[in-house]
């Protein structure tokens, strides 16, 4: 039994040098070798010989690099659908013995621009191998989607889908007249789902806070004094009326009541209660609970500086000093 000849019976023009790698992929190298053969077929060893004869970069490579590019050639022949293996006797099925021919598939061969193997056109195989119909070039987007996936077969696509506004499906058509409004209300009443926007869900999900201040610390307001027929307006009453007309510092609490409570309450208690009342269930991440008790004394003292001053902690309201 003689070994198959690996001599190439045609002339090969050398290209490149042994330093620069040729700008071709392994698929292009295989296609170049098979296309140069008169019979348009080659064995694996003949493909090796063609690549070595044409490109000194692969011929002059060391043993490790030579084994690497030869393995890549074998992998591309076995895994790429562009190439098929034929037996030497011409049968359709190739045997497991060495010396089989490799040739390109006529309907699935790699396409190149006028023999320029540097710029390879990748032929997309579509979805035909997955069990669906292949995509055909058509102007109707609906036809393309119906051929790609069976899920879109039952959908009715508009004819002008390519020129439509992409956000048109997400826009609500408001009625332009009283007649359109009446027709829209009839359609909404007949259907199970209404297109109107219900804002009550936000009211229930996000309740509006009435106050950030614990009103338990505020002293109850005094009952109004009984005024005689001859009303004498003292100076204190005038000041009180001015305070009443002022804008409350805290929502829900009048200015007079708030200022009166400040004079009767320890500022440190108000400051601590504000932190505790703000970090409620409604605002769990508003403030962290205090690490230490606010009634403790500082370990370091500074002349002319009071740590009980609320302005040191970022509060704008200046509370009067405790007596």
From Swiss-Prot:
Residues 21-122 bind DNA. It is found in: Nucleus. GO terms for biological process: anatomical structure morphogenesis; cell differentiation; gonad development; male germ-line sex determination; male gonad development; regulation of transcription by RNA polymerase II. GO terms for cellular component: nucleus. SUPFAM superfamilies: Winged helix' DNA-binding domain (SSF46785). Coiled coil: none annotated. Keywords: DNA-binding, Nucleus. InterPro entries: FH_FOXL2, Fork_head_dom, FOX_domain-containing, TF_fork_head_CS_1, TF_fork_head_CS_2, WH-like_DNA-bd_sf, WH_DNA-bd_sf. It comes from the Eukaryota. CDD domains: FH_FOXL2. PANTHER family: FORK HEAD DOMAIN-CONTAINING PROTEIN L1-RELATED, FORKHEAD BOX PROTEIN. Probable transcription factor. Binds to the DNA sequence motif 5'-[TA]TGTT[TG]T[TG][ATG]TT-3'. Regulates sexual dimorphism in the gonad, promoting male gonadal cell fates in chromosomally (XO) male animals, yet plays a role in gonadogenesis in both sexes; probably acts downstream of terminal regulator of sex determination tra-1, to control early gonadogenesis. Positively modulates expression of homeobox protein egl-5, probably acting indirectly, during early gonadal development. This is Forkhead transcription factor fkh-6. It comes from Caenorhabditis elegans. The gene is fkh-6.
């Amino acid at each position: 039994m003689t070994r198959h000849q690996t001599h190439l019976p045609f002339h090969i023009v050398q290209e490149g040098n042994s330093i620069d790698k040729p700008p071709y992929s392994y698929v292009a190298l295989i296609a170049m070798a098979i296309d140069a053969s008169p019979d348009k077929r080659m064995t694996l060893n003949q493909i090796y010989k063609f690549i070595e004869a044409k490109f000194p970069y692969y011929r002059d490579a060391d043993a490790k690099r030579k084994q690497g590019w030869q393995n890549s050639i074998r992998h591309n022949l076995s895994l790429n659908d562009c190439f098929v293996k034929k037996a030497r006797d011409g049968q359709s099925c190739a045997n497991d013995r060495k010396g089989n021919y490799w040739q390109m598939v006529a309907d699935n061969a790699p396409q190149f621009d006028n023999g320029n193997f540097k710029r390879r056109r990748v032929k997309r195989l579509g979805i035909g191998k997955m069990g669906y119909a292949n995509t055909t070039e058509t102007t109707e987007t609906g036809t393309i989607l119906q051929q790609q996936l069976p899920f879109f077969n039952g959908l009715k696509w508009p004819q002008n889908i390519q020129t439509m506004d992409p956000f048109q499906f997400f826009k609500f058509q408001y009625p332009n007249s009283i007649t359109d409004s009446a027709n829209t209300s009839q359609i909404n009443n007949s259907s199970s789902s209404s297109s109107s926007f219900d804002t009550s869900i936000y009211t229930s999900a996000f309740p509006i806070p009435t106050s950030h201040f614990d009103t338990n610390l505020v002293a109850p307001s005094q009952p109004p004094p009984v005024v005689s027929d001859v009303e004498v307006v003292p100076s204190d009453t005038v000041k009180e009326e001015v305070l009443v007309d002022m804008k409350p510092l805290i929502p829900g609490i009048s200015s007079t009541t708030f200022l009166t409570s400040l004079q009767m309450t320890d500022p440190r208690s108000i400051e601590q209660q504000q932190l505790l009342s703000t970090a409620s269930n409604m605002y769990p991440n508003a403030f962290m609970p205090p690490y230490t008790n606010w009634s403790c004394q500082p370990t370091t003292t500074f002349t002319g500086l009071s740590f009980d001053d609320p302005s040191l902690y970022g509060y704008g309201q200046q509370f009067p000093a405790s007596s």
